[in-house]
């Protein structure tokens, strides 16, 4: 296999990967699993309170207050204490926009809110009505140097004082939402905490070049991470009993997640309202009995922000898996750490991509050298192989036996040119997902005209350069392709790939371009060594 065939093989593998990926998105939606049962202690029937009791009014009319730290600004409705809006202050809505990115919102075009409350026998957040909390003030902002901001919302009913306390910390997208309940009534009360994320039902968007997922996900004691799409929600309600865990709604680069008390028994659930075109994913905990004169505190957290892996891993187990690298995660994670390390040194994500490419190509150089050496040896055997074809003609069995004998005598592996490529493909796929999933590349500039590595090149310069580098790689091939049809395919391959990559993120095209240029340099170096060994002769074209 000469280098032209290697290039074709690599291209076909890559295209096959993209087609398979898109097919998975479009047609291979798995049947929802709704009966996962974790090992939890027995809970009484009240713990399984029907989710139909949970309030799902997204248009509750209450006073709206603002909570803010240095990374986000939240809108909270005092009727129920739901978070109905979030602005991410360090992320622009669009490139070069002065407006912050809006994640949670509640308007005529889109509903995406984080609800929480107390249901059960003595619940205050049923469909019959929500708790109307009182709070002094409208705007609460974490001051510079302040380590924590607590904002208590207070509601009293039948001798019970309910305090819903929001806790903000500097630099954190994790919001603590704690219930402090003091029972001053003469009887014990029973409550079931719940929290859910409600979103307008939508389909995952994107393209073959940049697929994106918008939908639910969850983690339980038996499943570290699993997606549960809006389509799944419409087919069957999720109903998983587990200890710990979390529920989330994902979109490209951003996530909102409710994390309950990790020591409690919880039921993860979904709800859909087809009339209002809404879907919810949430959890409800085991019932809590509060005796008269007692006070109980219920802890929960809401993450609403970018997919920052290190921070999310500190908030909850496996929450960082929402940065979904697919099956290549074990390669992608260290590659991402390498990418961030290089970026911290060079202070440019484009240069960091080139740096990662250099490191990867250096690590793979022994495989690359073995590939070209094997191909060179195969070329040296071509006259003998052609002679065998002519001698044995239709006797394919004899010809195969003689060929294998020749390979053994010459110590040549006929698959030596393919195997290194197959071994490199998982690394390329891991890099692909690393660049696709990293929110750090969103609106990250390289230089000049490339101001957003997560978007396509606005002037298509990088794809054109990438196509030219592929053409140059072809021209460096030591032998022409004999088959006319294959020759035509190879002639148009750089053009096909150039058109294909017009719609890819600039960061991924930059990686491919850098990889091609490094391959050209490595190929030149390897061929020089092979010439000295008499295994390669330059062909004038």
From Swiss-Prot:
It is found in: Cell inner membrane. Its main location: membrane. One of its GO terms (biological process) is protein insertion into membrane. GO terms for molecular function: membrane insertase activity. Pfam families: 60KD_IMP, YidC_periplas. Keywords: Cell inner membrane, Cell membrane, Chaperone, Membrane, Protein transport, Transmembrane, Transmembrane helix, Transport. The chain crosses the membrane at residues 7-27, 345-365, 415-435, 453-473, 492-512. GO terms for cellular component: plasma membrane. It is a multi-pass membrane protein. Belongs to the OXA1/ALB3/YidC family. Type 1 subfamily. Required for the insertion and/or proper folding and/or complex formation of integral membrane proteins into the membrane. Involved in integration of membrane proteins that insert both dependently and independently of the Sec translocase complex, as well as at least some lipoproteins. Aids folding of multispanning membrane proteins. PANTHER family: CYTOCHROME C OXIDASE ASSEMBLY PROTEIN COX18, MITOCHONDRIAL (PTHR12428:SF65), OXA1 (PTHR12428). Interacts with the Sec translocase complex via SecD. Specifically interacts with transmembrane segments of nascent integral membrane proteins during membrane integration. HAMAP family: YidC_type1. This is Membrane protein insertase YidC. It comes from Histophilus somni (strain 2336) (Haemophilus somnus). The gene is yidC.
């Amino acid at each position: 296999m000469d280098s032209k065939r290697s290039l074709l093989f690599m291209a076909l593998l890559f295209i096959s990967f993209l087609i398979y990926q898109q097919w998975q998105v479009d047609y291979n939606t798995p049947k929802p699993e709704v009966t996962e049962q974790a090992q939890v202690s027995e809970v009484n029937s009240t713990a399984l309170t029907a989710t139909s009791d949970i309030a799902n009014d997204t248009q509750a009319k209450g006073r709206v207050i603002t909570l803010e730290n240095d990374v986000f600004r939240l809108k909270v409705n005092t009727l129920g204490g739901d978070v109905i809006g979030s602005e991410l202050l360090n992320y622009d809505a669009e490139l070069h926009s002065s407006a912050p990115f809006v994640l949670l919102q509640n308007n005529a075009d889109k509903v995406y809110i984080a609800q929480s409350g107390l249901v059960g026998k003595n619940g205050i957040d049923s469909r019959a009505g929500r708790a109307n909390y009182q709070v002094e003030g409208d705007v609460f902002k974490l001051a510079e140097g302040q380590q924590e901001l607590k904002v208590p919302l207070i509601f009293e009913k039948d001798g019970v004082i309910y305090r819903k306390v929001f806790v903000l910390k500097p630099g954190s997208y994790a919001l603590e939402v704690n219930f402090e309940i003091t029972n001053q009534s003469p009887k014990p009360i029973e409550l079931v905490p719940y929290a859910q994320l409600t979103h307008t039902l939508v389909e995952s968007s994107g393209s073959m070049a940049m697929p994106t997922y918008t939908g639910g996900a969850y983690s339980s004691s038996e499943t570290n991470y699993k997606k549960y799409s809006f389509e799944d929600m419409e087919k069957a309600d999720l109903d998983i009993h587990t200890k710990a865990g979390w529920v989330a709604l994902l979109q490209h680069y951003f996530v909102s997640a409710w994390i309950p008390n990790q020591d409690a028994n919880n039921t993860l659930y979904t709800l859909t309202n087809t009339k209002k075109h809404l879907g919810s994913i949430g959890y409800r905990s085991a019932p809590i009995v509060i005796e008269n004169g007692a006070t109980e505190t219920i802890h929960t957290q809401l993450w609403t922000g970018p997919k920052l892996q290190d921070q999310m891993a500190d908030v909850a187990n496996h929450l960082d898996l929402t940065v979904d690298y697919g099956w290549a995660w074990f390669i992608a994670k260290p590659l991402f750490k390498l990418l961030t390390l290089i970026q911290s040194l060079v202070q440019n994500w484009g240069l960091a991509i080139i740096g990662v490419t250099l490191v990867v190509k250096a690590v793979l150089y022994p495989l690359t050298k073995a590939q070209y050496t094997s191909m060179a040896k195969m070329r040296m055997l071509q006259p003998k192989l052609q002679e065998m074809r002519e001698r044995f003609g239709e006797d394919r069995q004899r010809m195969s036996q003689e060929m294998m004998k020749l390979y053994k005598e010459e110590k040549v592996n006929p698959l030596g040119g393919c195997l290194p490529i197959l071994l490199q493909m998982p690394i390329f796929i891991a890099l692909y997902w690393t660049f696709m999933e990293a929110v750090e590349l969103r609106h990250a500039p390289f230089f000049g005209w490339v101001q957003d590595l997560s978007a396509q090149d606005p002037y298509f310069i990088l794809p054109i350069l990438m196509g030219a580098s592929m053409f140059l790689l072809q021209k460096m091939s030591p032998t022409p392709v004999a088959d006319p049809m294959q020759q035509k395919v190879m002639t148009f391959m750089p053009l096909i790939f150039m058109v294909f990559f017009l719609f890819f993120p600039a960061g991924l095209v930059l990686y491919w371009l850098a990889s091609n240029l490094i391959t050209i340099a490595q190929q030149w170096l390897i061929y020089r060594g092979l010439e000295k060994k008499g295994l390669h002769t330059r062909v004038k074209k």
